[in-house]
């Protein structure tokens, strides 16, 4: 990460960074920290100096910065390693992830200002780790740190795309085109559930990102929500296809070109996206396996040239999906791929949403309490499922044998027993409320 010297050294330095070195640093600020009434006079002096001489202000600025660095780093007293340590610590303090500068300062002093000893004693309690960002590009997806440069993300995913294309070519399977994985502009949706409202739009992301074949590269960057979500196979929600969503926020990426991929001013769509939603079938179509999620976070209709709704069929089972992202998440189950790993217990998950739900277990937080028996739960959906024990409600009814169930997970396990003996056509039942 490049240092912005103007930001670091013209402004007041970090409060708790380097102890006594800051005194010399603050004293060298010069007239730039005068009282408010003296600012205009100083500005005129600087302007006149800049206009009347040949780049004298530029030379003065460089000399001022040299004095600041010299008085701060004191090369006559410190070795090269000590100077590097000072710069590293300063960058760590202003990097945005340090949440307890006072504690870091104390550890720096207690280590004798030795960087190696300081690193050994430093724990994650004093920093905010960078958030994880879920990136989806041309059918490939991965989890990256928010600090990772966009060019590295694109290079990594491009290698995955090329590897998959090579495998498909060897198998004689036509590869997916970029049109199949492009996300077109979807209509905004409003969702109100569990007291949570959201309104968002999914935007097609293809501006100025091209590869050597002049094909559009669609890049979706999804900021995963940390809120609780029902974990598949556990105590599930009262509606098997409801989920929380985050607003989509657009941001501008870096500019650059690498390995034939050009990306300039790439709009990045950030929000809770389709990949993070658990893949489940609705009760009405449990055996036809066609997704009917009208308010899904994949509210992106991919249509052909004649406006016909596309569908995506799994090659290993009869399931058909309306959205490509659901198919990709489903196929990971056939391959038993669990790319999302808990850093605490190393347990793998098929979907990022499952990982988020699992991580709440490690926190030990159970903020939702039953009003009848005072039992606590980590998720509101789990609480609602538990409350049905008291009310006797069983909203999930099998369309074949009319057996009712309190939890959707139990309902889906029961429906799989019918899949082995029933034709694909399934009578529909009213949606459980």
From Swiss-Prot:
GO MF entries: DNA-binding transcription factor activity, RNA polymerase II-specific; RNA polymerase II cis-regulatory region sequence-specific DNA binding; sequence-specific double-stranded DNA binding; zinc ion binding
Pfam families assigned: SCAN, zf-C2H2
Cellular location(s): Nucleus; Chromosome, Telomere
Keyword Glycosyltransferase appears in the UniProt entry: no
GO biological process, one term: negative regulation of mitotic recombination
Region (Disordered): 165-210, 275-301
Cellular component terms per the entry's GO annotation: chromosome, telomeric region; nucleus
Renumbered zinc finger spans (C2H2-type): 312-334, 340-362, 368-390, 396-418
Keywords: Chromosome, DNA-binding, Metal-binding, Nucleus, Repeat, Telomere, Transcription, Transcription regulation, Zinc, Zinc-finger
SUPFAM superfamilies registered for this protein in UniProt: beta-beta-alpha zinc fingers (SSF57667), Retrovirus capsid dimerization domain-like (SSF47353)
Record-annotated SCAN box domain positions: 44-126
Skewed-composition ranges (Polar residues): 165-185, 195-210, 277-299
Function description: Embryonic stem (ES) cell-specific transcription factor required to regulate ES cell pluripotency. Binds telomeres and plays a key role in genomic stability in ES cells by regulating telomere elongation. Acts as an activator of spontaneous telomere sister chromatid exchange (T-SCE) and telomere elongation in undifferentiated ES cells.
Protein name: Zinc finger and SCAN domain-containing protein 4
High-level lineage: Eukaryota, Metazoa, Chordata, Craniata, Vertebrata
């Amino acid at each position: 990460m490049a240092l912005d010297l103007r930001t670091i050294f013209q402004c007041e330095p970090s409060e708790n960074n380097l102890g006594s070195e800051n005194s010399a640093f603050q004293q060298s600020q010069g007239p730039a920290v005068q009282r408010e009434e003296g600012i205009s006079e100083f500005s005129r002096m600087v302007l006149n100096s800049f206009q009347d001489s040949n780049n004298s202000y530029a030379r003065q600025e460089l000399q001022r910065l040299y004095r600041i660095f010299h008085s701060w780093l004191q090369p006559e007293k410190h070795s090269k390693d000590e100077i590097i340590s000072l710069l590293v610590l300063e960058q760590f303090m202003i990097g945005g992830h340090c949440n307890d500068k006072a504690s870091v300062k104390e550890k720096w002093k207690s280590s004798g200002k030795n960087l190696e000893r300081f690193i050994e004693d430093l724990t994650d309690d004093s920093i905010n780790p960078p958030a994880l960002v879920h990136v989806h590009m041309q059918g490939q997806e991965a989890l990256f740190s928010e600090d990772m440069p966009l060019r590295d993300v694109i290079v990594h995913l491009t290698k995955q795309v090329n590897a998959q294309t090579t495998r498909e070519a060897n198998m004689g399977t036509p590869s997916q085109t970029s049109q199949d994985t492009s996300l077109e502009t979807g209509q905004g949706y409003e969702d109100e559930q569990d007291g949570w409202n959201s309104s968002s739009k999914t935007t097609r992301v293809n501006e100025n990102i091209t590869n050597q074949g002049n094909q559009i590269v669609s890049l979706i960057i999804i900021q995963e929500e940390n809120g609780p979500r029902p974990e598949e196979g556990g105590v599930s929600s009262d509606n098997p296809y409801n989920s929380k969503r985050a607003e989509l926020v657009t941001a501008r990426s870096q500019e650059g070109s690498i390995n034939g991929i050009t990306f300039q001013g790439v709009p990045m769509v950030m929000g809770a996206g389709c990949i993070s939603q658990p893949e489940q079938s609705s009760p009405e179509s449990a055996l036809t396996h066609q997704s009917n999620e009208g308010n899904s976070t994949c509210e992106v209709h991919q249509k052909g040239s004649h406006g016909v709704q596309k569908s995506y069929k799994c090659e290993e089972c009869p399931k058909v999906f309306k959205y490509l992202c659901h198919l990709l998440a489903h196929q990971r189950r056939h391959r038993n791929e669990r790319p999302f790993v808990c850093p605490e217990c190393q347990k793998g998950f098929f979907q990022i949403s499952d990982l988020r739900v699992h991580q709440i277990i490690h926190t030990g937080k159970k903020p939702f309490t039953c009003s009848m028996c005072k039992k606590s739960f980590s998720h509101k959906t789990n609480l609602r499922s538990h409350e049905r024990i008291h009310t006797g409600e069983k909203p999930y009814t099998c369309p074949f044998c009319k057996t009712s169930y309190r939890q959707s997970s139990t309902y889906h396990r029961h429906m799989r027993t019918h899949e082995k003996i029933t034709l694909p056509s399934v009578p529909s039942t009213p949606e459980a409320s």
